[in-house]
Swiss-Prot record:
Source species, domain of life: Eukaryota
UniProt topology in membrane: Multi-pass membrane protein
Sites where the protein binds Cu cation A2: 196, 198, 200, 204
Topology, Mitochondrial matrix side: 46-59
Gene assigned in the entry: MT-CO2
Species, as recorded: Sus scrofa
Protein name, per record: Cytochrome c oxidase subunit 2
Length: 228
């Protein structure tokens, strides 16, 4: 869960989000080193009075500043491609959930069950109970089993939306006429909040997402109660 004046990412609760945090730190270190080197060179150029007459035609320097950026780009691209593959590859999911974006709410369908569907609307501020989050609570939470691979199918009924849950490293565009997929797995139970991340109209800010990750036995009890 995010908190006021937060500078970093939310705590990772999925393997993909952990990989994204490592990649962020890896890339930030490279950017910091490059920025430090550039600032050092600029300070030298501003403070020294000496000039190197052969710098205008130095093959060695040109070779270095051609090869070195290529190596840096490779060091950034390789872990990025690995994470992209992890996010797209879904092997034998234990559960498939289809979510549809509407103006301005979400609907969910558990495709492994015969008739388990519901809509999820934001709870108005006037109806909130003590301790609940303003603009983030919904009337129907998405209950899912933890420590299991879940496939999310994301689409839209009307305009562009985006289904995003930051602490799980999820952000998938909901496009009318197209079915996108992403994988989800939580390493611990809890409530995970998200919102629509694509401006979709006047009530775009009122499309929260709440995932409730629970142990498998509690998920089975919940699904049974929803079907009866």
């Amino acid at each position: 869960m995010a908190y006021p004046f937060q500078l970093g990412f939310q705590d990772a609760t999925s393997p993909i989000m952990e990989e994204l945090l490592h990649f962020h730190d890896h890339t930030l270190m490279i950017v910091f080193l490059i920025s430090s080197l550039v600032l050092y060179i600029i300070s030298l150029m501003l403070t020294t009075k000496l000039t190197h007459t052969s710098t205008m035609d130095a093959q060695e320097v040109e070779t270095i500043w051609t090869i070195l950026p290529a190596i840096i780009l490779i060091l950034i691209a390789l872990p990025s491609l690995r994470i992209l593959y992890m996010m797209d590859e879904i092997n034998n999911p234990a559960l498939t959930v289809k979510t549809m974006g509407h103006q301005w709410y979400w609907s969910y369908e558990y495709t492994d069950y015969e008739d388990l569907t519901f809509d999820s609307y934001m709870i108005p501020t006037s109806d909130l109970k003590p301790g609940e989050m303003r603009l983030l609570e919904v009337d129907n939470r998405v209950v899912l089993p933890m420590e299991m691979t879940i496939r999310m199918l994301v689409s839209s009924e009307d305009v562009l939306h985006s289904w995003a849950v930051p602490s799980l490293g999820l952000k998938t565009d909901a496009i009318p006429g197209r079915l996108n997929q992403t994988t989800l797995m939580s390493t611990r139970p809890g409530l995970y909040y998200g919102q629509c991340s694509e401006i979709c109209g006047s009530n775009h800010s009122f499309m929260p997402i709440v995932l409730e990750l629970v142990p498998l036995k509690y998920f089975e009890k919940w699904s049974t109660s929803m079907l009866t």
